[in-house]
Structure formats: structure tokens, C-alpha cells
Amino acid sequence: MRKLKFICQLLIAFIIASLGYNIFYEPHQETVRAAVRQQFNQAGGAGQEAGGQLKITMLDVGHGDAILLSTAGRNVMIDTGDSRNLAQLEAGLARAQVKRVHTVFVTHHHEDHMGNTLKVAGKYGVSRIYDSGYPNARAANSVRLNQVLRAGNYNNRVLRAGDTVYLGKNYYVEVLSPDASLSRELAANLNNTSLVMLLHYGSFTMLFMGDAEKEIEGLLAEKYGARLKADILKVGHHGSRTSSIYRLTSRVKPAYALISCGPFELYHHPNKNVVGSLRHLGARVLTTADNGSITVLTDGKSFSVETER
């Protein structure tokens, strides 16, 4: 009888432990926390191991941004490109053998960044969409996306500076901009409403600037200083002269500067002075116009960069 009682107690303990595991440990659930930290590297600094290899692909989608982050069968996108270039986006995702996109970050509501978001959400089973919450009233795709998100679909959350989105083991993004106190004057330029995010994967870091322009870059340089240091910089506003001030880039000091842009004749991106300044800092500058899709591979300790051409 005692033996039977002991077995029953073990069984009950096992059931309780299993329930606790399922309730409190959700390895694929993303969480957002208002981060109150003195240093960015407290949760993912040097020596931190990540969960396997992270593959970051800046897809060649012509003029626009569409960046794919893949690890352990889980896919995240930062922007989805222009709706006019949907075929290029889908071809890039097909080459990457993407069947599902779990999460999308919309940096801001310009067509060349968010134009395919709802199409991606519908086709690839997106479960969560983050954005900065500033719609473009003059663009139908933005108006529609804003309506869908503000209605609470796709587990939407508006992000602000200080938020942290955890994506996996020692794998998270820190939101640096827009600040909750962003002025109406600055927000009138949608580029300045861009989500600026610092990605951490183990000790590897990559700074995504969206289309943030000089005014925002100056504020970031003043607020964060040397904490902006990153291995790779996703250059702001396609390498336009409106962005990439030395005050910011000299704090980032990237080994690589990646630019997503279409043919030079279209918008004259990237600006030659911007490219020259980045090279002066020691960065190797790559563009999707010249190099095709650009892929970064990292295990959280070291990284490599490959190009399509």
C-alpha cells in the first residue's frame, strides 16, 4: 500500500511539474518588456551563447527594404518591401525555403517598407506584427494595415524606445526609436517615425536604422553614445544623403554597412558621400543593387557575410 501511495505521489508531482513547464516556459513566445538598463549588453553581451545559427538575409527587392531573420525553423521579417515588387519578394522567400513567417516588424508606413505586409501575413501565416503606430494617411496600403492592426489583429503591439522584444535564447531586439516624446514636427516626416532597433544574438549585434534621418540620428548619438557600437549597420534610408551622419556612424563603427536600394538612376541611392564616409570608418559597404541579396551568418560569437553576386 505504501509503495502504491509513493507511486501516486510521484505521478502527481510529475503532472504538476509538466503543467508548470507548459505554463511558464514557452521557448517560441515573444515577449515585450520596457527595458530599464544601463548597458545594452547586460542580457546578451560577450561570452553569451545563442541557440544555433542565425541567418540574416537582406533580400534584393529593388527599391525598398525586406530583411529575413531565420533560426531553428523560425522566421522573422523586418519590413516587406514595395507592393510593386511582390514577385521579387516571393522569389527571395522561395529561395530561402520559407514556408512560414512568424513575426513581422514594420519599421514605418512608407510603401517601400510595408507594402507587402498584409500579403505576407496572409500567405505565410504571420502570428504577430509590430509597428511604430504612425500610419500614412495618403497611402491605401498603410491605411488598410493600420485599420487591421489597430483592431487588434496579429497580436499587434506598438513599439517605443525602451521596449525589448525577445525572440529566443540570447536573441532579442532593443528598440531605440521612436521615443514616446517624439515631437509632432519630427513625426510629420514618416522616415523619422521608423523603428530603430539593435539586434542582439549572443555577442553579435546589428543596428537596423529603418529610414531614420539626420535629426533622429543626432538624438540617438547623444542619448546612446558608444552603446550604438554594432558589428553590422543596416544603413538608414537606402544610403540617402538625408541620413548616416558621421556623429552616428562613428559611434556604430561597423565592420560592414549594408544598403538595400534599387538602380542608382532611380533615386540616386546610395549617396557617394555617405558611402565614402562609411568606408573611411573602415566599413565594407555592400548594396543589393550591386551585390544582390546579402546574407549574414552568425553563431552569436563570430559572423560571416555572403553575397548573391
What kind of feature is each model-predicted range?
Residues 2-309:
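Non-globular, low-confidence helical/coil segments that flank catalytic cores
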